[in-house]
Amino acid sequence: MAYVFEQMEATDYEKVNTKLKNRDSLDILRWANQTYGEKLVYACSFGAEAMVLLDLLSKIQKEAHILFLDTDFHFAETYELIERVKERYPTFRINMAKPALSPEEQAERYGDELWLKNPDQCCQIRKLDVLARELEPYDAWLSGLRREQSPTRANTEFVNQDKRFKKVKVCPLIHWTEEEIWMYIKLHQLPYNELHDQHYPSIGCTYCTKAVMPGEDARSGRWAGTGKTECGLHAPTKGDS
């Protein structure tokens, strides 16, 4: 069968995940590459998990499509890391996708500091709308989600029905622990965001990310004080598998 969103029912996801359940991350990437080919893209945050997934992906598809949601609000360290990734994996096709509105246009239309007044709307404009637009040519997208990251990610499967974007979402790292991620990074001497060494386990936009103190949840530095824990790219919707 064709593993595309429009042709797959919930039972089809169950079947393919049963088939793949004992495979490792490289096997999942091979399956995704063989299944989707040029219709597969990795929506990459360039976080710690991303460094592992990029390295694994380079062993399967050296000319993989990589999508970065360039909100215009990222840390300088994030942009510096992307340049290092380009040097290490020069054949990756990296798309730095920007929102329809510049920061100035957003401020003019919605007022200054939208990320404070309405963080959901800011994420919608600068991330979700961009991802929806950029995913159009593709049938499936890769993500570095891990089950242990948060309760909202605990039920993530290798192959997921993404009803928000109407695509198949493939997550090869669901069983990895944070310790394993960092062991792999150190073992293979991979580049990573220097902010990770400054108590930033999860890194997003400058205005919505702060350092996390020992004992705090790893994602507590994102949208701190707002009750918001996800930008919406991976927030589960009813009926998602």
From Swiss-Prot:
InterPro entries: APS_reductase, PAPS/APS_Rdtase, PAPS_reduct_dom, Rossmann-like_a/b/a_fold. Pathway: Sulfur metabolism; hydrogen sulfide biosynthesis; sulfite from sulfate. One of its GO terms (cellular component) is cytoplasm. [4Fe-4S] cluster binds at C122, C123, C205, C208. GO terms for biological process: cysteine biosynthetic process; hydrogen sulfide biosynthetic process; sulfate assimilation, phosphoadenylyl sulfate reduction by phosphoadenylyl-sulfate reductase (thioredoxin). Keywords: Cytoplasm, Iron, Iron-sulfur, Metal-binding, Oxidoreductase. The active site is at C231 (nucleophile). The keyword Oxidoreductase applies. Binds 1 [4Fe-4S] cluster per subunit. It catalyses: [thioredoxin]-disulfide + sulfite + AMP + 2 H(+) = adenosine 5'-phosphosulfate + [thioredoxin]-dithiol. SUPFAM superfamilies: Adenine nucleotide alpha hydrolases-like. Its EC number is 1.8.4.10. One of its GO terms (molecular function) is metal ion binding. It is found in: Cytoplasm. Its cofactor is [4Fe-4S] cluster. Pfam families: PAPS_reduct (PF01507). CDD domains: PAPS_reductase. Catalyzes the formation of sulfite from adenosine 5'-phosphosulfate (APS) using thioredoxin as an electron donor. NCBIfam families: APS_reductase, cysH, PRK02090.1. Belongs to the PAPS reductase family. CysH subfamily. This is Adenosine 5'-phosphosulfate reductase. It comes from Shouchella clausii (strain KSM-K16) (Alkalihalobacillus clausii).
